[in-house]
């Protein structure tokens, strides 16, 4: 069993919050984590069981009334329970009454956010990070960077090792498969399961058969500014339907759109979000990319690596305890920064991702523009690259190993 650094945050939330919602994509490890907490005096019920699900839907109030402290797995399958849970915790306001898990972002549903406002904390569990896979301990990346200290890496993963780590992804079940063919077969079967089960749970979709095809087209655009019209045209969907279906995949934690960073002082910034997949193994499987193909053509690896870094940064942010916002920078002169991270004090980190083993001054062009735009708020700009050395490139500008995110 892999260590999950999110566990400490969940346990802390259960000490002072009536309802804790653990959300993330199917098969990311939510059930395993929840079951470990169910051993601590909590009943465990799963709505993946047909009989249990039928009982919950038939009489939500009676179902919840019979539970004192409980873990309810896959809550998105019976959202009717949420109002009954609200009524229960309003009567008995002890912290840690309910730990819910869900394979969809229920907080995007107005009735959920309204009914449990002030009563529930939401914690996201994404697929395994590299630090969890290697059991290296939670990295102190954000602590160091916001303190103005250069990034360090105590475990060098470069070249072929980096490619294999990225394309393996972070789903625990996929990592048990020994061959690349078997691993990618798991990912493709996973997509079918998500479409047939999770999509049906949260949305009425008229053209369900288009969803796997749409996800493959989205995979080809990961790391790019999203164009719903162009993406939809590839599979015969209009702009509105494509946007709606894409939002469903985001609600299921398969993809993430990064909004553009904006400033009232700058008028020449693009306003289009950027698309990323939250698991690079899934992304690689949808594109049919293997380590052997990367050896033949390194160019196919760049955008997959960028999405991988975005996901790793989001996982680190989830453990850090800081509320960090993620965006991306791009101006009309084509200067860009892959990831802009801002804390509650307005301090900013810029991250650019390079699949190459060398970096030059030109790679910092976008970061320098961001630095000019943010002034004293600019904490550090990083170009993360495929090497094991951190190299300074000017005031608060560094080239650093991608593996500084791992340990």
Segments the model singles out, each with a brief description of its role:
Residues 82-100, 104-106, 113-115:
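Conserved catalytic/switch belt of AAA+ P-loop NTPases
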Residues 386-407:
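Domain-level recognition of nuclease-like catalytic cores that cleave nucleotide substrates
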Residues 30:
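Conserved lysine of the Walker
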Residues 1-14:
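Pre-Walker A adenine-sensing motif
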Residues 33, 37:
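Hydrophobic positions on the alpha1 helix immediately C-terminal to the Walker A/P-loop
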């Amino acid at each position: 069993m892999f260590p999950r650094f999110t566990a400490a945050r969940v346990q802390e939330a259960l000490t002072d919050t009536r309802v804790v919602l653990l959300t993330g994509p199917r098969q990311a490890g939510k059930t395993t984590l929840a079951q470990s907490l169910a051993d601590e005096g909590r009943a465990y019920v799963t709505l993946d069981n047909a009989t249990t699900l039928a009982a919950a839907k038939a009489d939500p109030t009676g179902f919840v009334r019979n539970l004192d402290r409980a873990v309810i797995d896959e809550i998105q399958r019976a959202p009717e329970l949420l109002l009954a849970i609200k009524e229960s915790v309003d009567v008995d306001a002890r912290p840690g009454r309910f730990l819910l898990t869900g394979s969809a972002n229920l907080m995007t549903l107005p009735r959920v956010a309204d009914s449990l406002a002030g009563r529930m904390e939401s914690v996201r569990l994404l697929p395994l990070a590299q630090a969890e896979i290697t059991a290296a301990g939670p990295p102190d990346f954000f602590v160091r960077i916001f303190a103005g200290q250069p990034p360090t890496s105590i475990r060098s993963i470069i070249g072929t090792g980096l490619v294999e780590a990225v394309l393996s992804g972070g789903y625990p079940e996929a990592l048990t498969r020994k061959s690349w063919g078997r691993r990618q077969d798991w990912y493709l079967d996973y997509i079918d399961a998500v479409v047939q089960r999770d999509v049906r749970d949260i949305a009425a979709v008229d053209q369900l058969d288009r969803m796997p095809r749409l996800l493959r087209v989205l995979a080809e655009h990961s790391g790019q500014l999203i164009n719903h019209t162009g993406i939809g045209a590839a599979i015969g969907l209009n702009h509105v339907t494509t946007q709606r279906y894409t939002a469903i995949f985001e609600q299921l934690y398969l993809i993430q759109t990064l909004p553009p960073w904006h400033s009232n002082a700058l008028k020449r910034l693009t306003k289009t979000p950027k698309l990323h997949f939250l698991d690079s193994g899934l992304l690689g499987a949808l594109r049919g990319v293997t380590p052997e193909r990367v050896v033949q053509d390194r160019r196919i690896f760049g955008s997959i690596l960028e999405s991988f870094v975005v996901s790793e940064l989001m996982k680190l942010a989830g453990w850090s305890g800081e509320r960090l916002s993620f965006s991306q920078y791009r101006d009309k002169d084509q200067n860009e920064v892959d990831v802009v991270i801002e804390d509650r004090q307005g301090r900013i980190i810029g991250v650019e991702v390079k699949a190459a083993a060398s970096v030059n001054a030109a790679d910092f062009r976008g970061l320098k523009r961001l630095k000019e735009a943010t002034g004293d708020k600019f904490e550090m700009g990083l170009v993360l690259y495929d090497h094991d050395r951190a190299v300074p490139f000017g005031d608060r500008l560094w080239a650093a190993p991608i593996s500084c995110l791992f340990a």
